[in-house]
Amino acid sequence: LATGLGISSVVIALAAQDIAKSFLAGISIISDRPFEIGDYITVGDLSGTVEDITFRTTRIRNADDQVIVLPNSVLSDNNIINSSKRDCRRFRIVLTLELDTPLKKVTQLTENIKLALTTHPQVINETVKVFFETISADGIDLSIDLKTSALEYVDYLKFKEEINYTLLDMVNQAKIGLAYPSQSIYLKKD
């Protein structure tokens, strides 16, 4: 009987310790406010929109519309990325042009892309970088990197779509082909 009571006491003490840790973490979250209801956060491999914050737990809803209940102690023990607090979003793409593209066309396309991007109203101009990055077996890589003021996810998707259409149109107007990975297979006669 004494052994049973001893084990029960240890289990209760451990449970109380976890509850106390989550409660103290909840107080810290509520006072420090690293995120608020409605913010989109990432904790470890979990991401979602914060729906509720209590002293013991935080509820987030993920992209699959599932509610995840996290003990606040888990939040306090991990890095929290609050995507709702950012000032801008990064857009990066690499265009791979055909290897036989004349250098003059590559240079002109690079300059035209820079001009088009720096005049776009949602592009933060000083962040635009367009460079002839490398020559690979697949083709000539143009690296395009910038930041945009389109913060909301749907707005960002629309921005990306618009930029991708613009880039594709510019490549087509320059009469430059986009490269794609290919392989040559040589058959040997015996």
Q: Which functions belong to the PLM regions below?
A:
Residues 2-15:
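Small-residue-enriched core segments of transmembrane alpha-helices in multipass membrane transport
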Residues 6, 45-48, 134:
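Transmembrane helix-bundle signature of multi-pass membrane transporters/permeases
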Residues 12, 59-61, 143-145:
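Short, acidic/hydrophobic/Gly-rich beta-strand patch recurrent on exposed beta strands
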Residues 15-19, 100:
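Hydrophobic transmembrane alpha-helical segments of multi-pass transport and channel proteins
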Residues 18-30:
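Membrane-spanning helices that line or support transport/gating and their immediate boundary helices
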Residues 27-124:
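Soluble accessory domains appended to multi-pass membrane transport proteins
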Residues 81-83, 89-92, 97-190:
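Solvent-exposed, non-transmembrane regulatory segments of membrane-associated proteins
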